[in-house]
Design a protein with these regions (language model features):
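Short, Asp-centered acidic motifs that coordinate Mg2+ and/or phosphate
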Residues: 96
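Alpha-helix C-terminal capping segments
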Residues: 85-91, 118-129
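Short, glycine-rich nucleotide/cofactor-binding loops
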Residues: 12-19, 110-111
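Glycine/threonine-rich flexible loop motifs
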Residues: 105-114
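Glycine-rich phosphate/pyrophosphate-binding loops
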Residues: 124-146
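A cross-family phosphate/adenosyl-ligand binding-site feature
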Residues: 2-10, 21-88, 92-93
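Electrostatically charged, flexible surface regions
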Residues: 145-201
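Short beta-strand segments
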Residues: 13, 39-41, 99-102, 133-134, ...
Length: 201
C-alpha cells in the first residue's frame, strides 16, 4: 500500500539488532500505521546505554528484510541509529520513535544501561516523542504475540493523541497471552539494582 505524504512517519530502532525477533514483531505490528523507517544496529548492542561511536567510521546500508518497509542497518549503537536517522536518512522529523521490542525487561536501573531505552531517550532529546517496548521474557523461545498486540494499541493511541515532544514512555509487557492481559497500568519506575558477581581468573 502506497503511503500518503500526510501519513505519520514512524522511526523504529532497537538494541538487539536488525534481525532480532523483537524488531520483526514490532515492524509487523505497526507497518500499516504510517511510513515506517527502520534504522537498527547490524549486530546486538544490548547494555550500550547512551554510548555513541567516536574515532571510527559510522556506516549504514539499505537492507530489504520486509516488503514495503524502508530499512537500514547501522554499524553503531542504538543512539547512533537515532542520530543517523534524524540527520542523514529521514527527510522530515518523525512523528514517533519506537524502540524494541526488547528481549527482556527494562525497568528500574535497567533503563540506564539499556540501549533500547537510550535510543528512545535520544529521540525525545531531539523533540521526537518516543516509546521503548520490552517483553519480560529472556528465553530463546520467547513469544512476542502479546507484546505485538499491545505495541500496536499503544502506538495507535499516541498517533491519535500525540504526547509532549520530549515524552518517553517505557512499556514492559508481561509473559502472558494477549487474552490474559487485562489492560495497561501507568506507574513510576521502581528502585532496584543488581547484585554483581565477578569471577576472578
Amino acid at each position: 500500500m502506497a503511503k500518503d505524504k500526510k501519513d505519520p512517519t514512524i522511526l523504529i530502532t532497537n538494541d538487539d539488532g536488525i534481525t532480532s525477533p523483537g524488531i520483526r514483531n514490532l515492524v509487523e505490528a505497526v507497518k500499516d500505521l504510517g511510513k515506517v523507517v527502520v534504522v537498527a544496529p547490524d549486530k546486538p548492542q544490548s547494555g550500550m546505554g547512551h554510548a555513541i561511536t567516536i574515532g571510527k567510521p559510522l556506516r549504514f546500508d539499505r537492507v530489504d528484510l520486509y516488503e514495503g518497509v524502508e530499512m537500514y542497518k547501522c554499524s553503531g549503537t542504538p543512539v547512533d541509529c537515532v542520530k543517523l536517522a534524524r540527520d542523514k536518512i529521514l527527510d522530515r522529523t518523525p512523528d514517533l520513535c519506537v524502540s524494541g521490542i526488547n528481549h527482556g525487561a527494562n525497568h528500574s536501573i535497567n533503563i540506564i544501561y539499556s540501549g533500547t531505552m537510550s535510543a528512545a531517550v535520544e529521540a525525545a532529546i531531539e523533540s521526537i516523542p518516543a516509546i521503548g517496548f520490552s517483553l519480560l521474557d529472556y528465553s530463546l523461545e520467547a513469544d512476542f504475540s502479546a507484546s505485538r498486540k499491545y505495541a500496536r494499541i499503544i502506538v495507535e493511541q499516541l498517533l491519535k493523541s500525540p504526547p509532549d515532544k520530549h515524552c518517553v514512555l517505557n512499556v514492559n509487557i508481561r509473559i502472558e497471552t494477549a487474552v490474559d492481559i487485562k489492560g495497561v497500568k501507568v506507574c513510576r519506575q521502581t528502585y532496584a539494582k543488581y547484585e554483581e558477581d565477578f569471577i576472578e581468573r
